[in-house]
Structures are given as C-alpha cells and as structure tokens.
Design a protein with these regions (language model features):
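Iron-sulfur cluster-binding electron-transfer modules in prokaryotic oxidoreductases
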Residues: 1-185
Length: 185
C-alpha cells in the first residue's frame, strides 16, 4: 500500500529489483483502495459534506506511470458536490514541479516556482476553491505554488475529502443507556 505517487512508483516497479524477488501480492495505491471500498459499498458517503468546488491535480507517478486516472475522479464524484477538471488532465496534466526530488533541494526553489506557473494558471482557470491531490510531494509543492502566486485556494489530500464525506454509523445504544433514558422520562 502506497500513499504518494513516489512511494507507489518505488513499491510497484522498483522495490522488487532491490529485494531480489517478486512480491506475493499486488501493490496498490491508497487511491485504488479507496475507490474499491466505495465501489463495494464499504464506505457510506455524503458528498453534501464537501460543498466547495474541487479540482484534482494528477500526480505524475500515479497518472502517467501508473495509469491511475479514473479512480480519483470516481472518488471525487462520490465525495464532493462540485468537481471540475483541469485542462489538460489525467496523464496529460501539467506536472506541479515538485517531483524527482526537486522539492527537497532548496537550491532549485526558483526553478520549482517557475515550473509552478503553468500549474497556477491551470488551477485559476477552474475556479476551484480546493485543489485535491493524492501525493504528499505534490501537496507540498502545490502549497508552495499557492503561496508564491497568491492563489486563493486550499490544497488538500484527496483522502481528507473522503474522510470528511464519511457518514459514520451511530454506535449501538447499550442496554444501560436505554434504561437511563427511560428513567429520565
């Protein structure tokens, strides 16, 4: 199970080379698992809990390399009221500029900010109030792009929107609680 695009890529395609044998299981992205749980009805969701307009930034390692394009959109269609696509999107979406280790190299901050201009323009064109993504490197880079270009958006992990939409079942009332309620009447 991998949360971010970079973790997914390293676990899905590279780790078996390092450990010298194939995994006896399928490596999944957390996005794939969330979509699976929604399809199976294992999550009770209320999209009205996410009213603001949301757009999605496709992490390069998930969309381009992993083909994980429909899953985040399926999740958003089930967790938010107003989802709008960036153009282009999916495997053609613009890179945020934070991948390839660039985010951790402060000496390349100006290059990252310059690369983020296309992403800032892309975000603005959607009119979204929230930019969701499913990679922590992208999350940090998009937050930096937001600050640098003074974008009036909130950057959130896709999982935060899922968590906000979950309708948790009420715990069963204990027999003692039922008796106490009756006594108070």
């Amino acid at each position: 199970m991998a949360e971010c695009g970079h973790g997914y890529r390293s676990q899905r395609w590279e780790a078996e080379n390092w450990i010298g044998h194939r995994y006896p299981f399928k490596v999944m992205s957390f996005v794939e698992l969330q979509a699976q749980y929604i399809r199976e009805g294992r999550l009770n969701l209320d999209p009205t809990r996410n009213q603001k307009r949301v757009t999605f930034h496709d992490p390069c390692n998930q969309a381009r390399n992993g083909g994980i394009v429909e899953e985040p959109r399926y999740i958003l269609r089930n967790t938010v009221m107003d989802f709008v696509e960036m153009e282009p999107h999916g495997a053609e979406n613009y890179c945020c500029g934070g991948g390839g280790g660039m985010l951790s190299m402060t000496e390349f901050a100006s290059e990252r900010k310059a690369a983020g201009k296309a992403k800032a323009d892309q975000i603005l064109a959607t009119g979204a109030e929230i930019v969701a993504t499913s990679c922590h490197n992208c999350l940090d880079q998009l937050d930096e792009v937001k600050r640098h270009y003074k974008l009036k958006v909130k950057i959130q992990n896709l999982s935060e929107l899922v968590a906000n939409a979950i309708v948790w079942p009420k715990p069963p009332e204990s027999e003692e609680s039922s008796q106490e309620a009756e006594e108070k009447k």
